[in-house]
Amino acid sequence: MLTSEQTGRNNGRLNANTHARRQGGHHERSGKEAHALDRRWRTGGINTAECLIAMEAQLNRITGMQQPLGKRFDMIGGTSTGAILAAGLCLGRSATELRDFYLSYGEEIFTKVVLPLRFWHKYSADPLTGRLKEKFGEATKLSDGTLLTNLLVVSKNATQGATWFFNNNPRGKFFANNRDLPLWQVVRSSTAAPTYFPPQKMAVPDATGRTVEYEFIDGGVSTFNNPAFQVFLEATEPSYAYGWPTGVDKLLLISLGTGYCPLSIAGGKASDYNILDWAKYTVSDRRTTRIFSKPIDVADR
């Protein structure tokens, strides 16, 4: 979650009017704000980064202190392109620097592969992989001490058919297994959108110490395209080993995204819907309703 150090309230969103502290967790700070970045590709990454730039500037103005968002929030989570932004913020990158990442390398990353390969995916993973290694550091691990705050990345384990949540909480159930996973690889796994990029292979140790290779695809291919609810659960549900207190005076969840699909249909228009229209509507409705039901395909990592 994004948790702010600030006191006072500005338009009810940027600051939490609280001095409460967590009773456990990885990074300690006063106040609680949760920040989830849902997935959008080229335009979404840039647009969400612009929202982050505005937030960063506003907080710097209010506090009179120049600080990256990674130092102002206790947890930052992201799915797909949101995972790139979340990881960058946790490493202390400025919102402007992350926006420039998309502007500088978008064309390179989204260069289409030769025709025979397009049957499987539009783009090669090599440019994106190279830039993620360059931006986050090839040797940076999920447990790296350079991460300024708690990180949550959503990915879909295609081999198991389960949604995996990668985090850097040392008290988390699967932290011992995941601590040495390269950060760039975790982020790349969350951005592996089917038909756009090939899956990301990752070798992950199991409970017996045996290493198992899995294939991961975009975390948006799950009910956690917008990870806000999972970020809230990670922070507050005791089984996730944070156990932060809830309440309007103790925690603030900020969810930044650049798209919304309304489920309402204008009067008289439903009768005009064709098969494709109803397919899209059904998928949107399923994502909306399932996020509030008990997850059956998830594995906290």
Predicted regions and their residues:
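Active-site gating loop/helix substructures
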Residues: 43, 48, 110-111, 146-237
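Extended hydrophobic secondary-structure segments that form protein cores and membrane-embedded regions
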Residues: 35-39, 71-80, 150-156, 215-218, ...
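Flexible loop/turn segments at secondary-structure boundaries
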Residues: 43-44, 86, 223-224, 260-263
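Active-site periphery "cap/insert" segments of enzyme catalytic domains
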Residues: 126-148, 162-165
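Short helix-terminating capping/connector loops at secondary-structure junctions
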Residues: 28-31, 65-71, 143-148, 209, ...
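Non-catalytic peripheral regions of patatin-like phospholipases
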Residues: 95-127, 168-172, 178, 225, ...
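Patatin-like phospholipase
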Residues: 12-35, 43-135, 173-176, 185, ...
